[in-house]
């Protein structure tokens, strides 16, 4: 008999520190989430040092700027940051707008017209020399590069 627990969709469970600490099959670990943002977007793991990560449902990862007992049955805990139980992990719009300014790779700067098209959710063909997959779209506002969302480059 397996000692693995099952996912309970009505509660938040803190992510295990590492894959070796996992007690629910398929659940991401804190290390894997932090590594994803570091490897995909070049975000320094130290950015996430004071945050806890939680799963509610299957693969909906939340980030919380504090700690709480685990499990906990509440409607929301921080903000959603990542979807993991699919082939390619997808960061949320909120995560990109909050943490995207720390990214050093897979960031595409959009001019005014392209940024407006992006904001409307329309597909567009843009030249990109980097990797395919999810990119952080940015636009310069007031002289500063601001993340406006996440887009899929194929």
Q: Where are the predicted features?
A:
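Polybasic, low-complexity RNA-engagement segments
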Residues: 2-154
